Amino acid sequence: MMQDTNQDNMQQLVAEIAKALVDDPQAVEVQAVARDENTVLRLRVASADVGKVIGKQGRTARSMRTILSAVSMKLHHRYTLDILEEDEAGRPADS
């Protein structure tokens, strides 16, 4: 039960940070994929906003991952961040 609450909080944290950065906050989605040792948070944003979330030389994405890492230490559970983009129709784009 506590793990679910932590996971929801982490998803909300990533979503709020991303929404503050992008032009299309409605398109921001965060999906959690639980694994044995860690949880992967998949952040999906509109194609036009991917650069804003990644940032110059990946600095923004690295900063988001650093925050996740710091919170992960407190929760004793590893969270990682994957940044995905959608095409104009809202489907995952082929990378």
Residue ranges and their predicted role:
Residues 1-50, 62-63, 67-95:
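RNA-contacting regions in translation and RNA-metabolism proteins
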Residues 54-58:
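Glycine-centered tight-turn and secondary-structure capping sites
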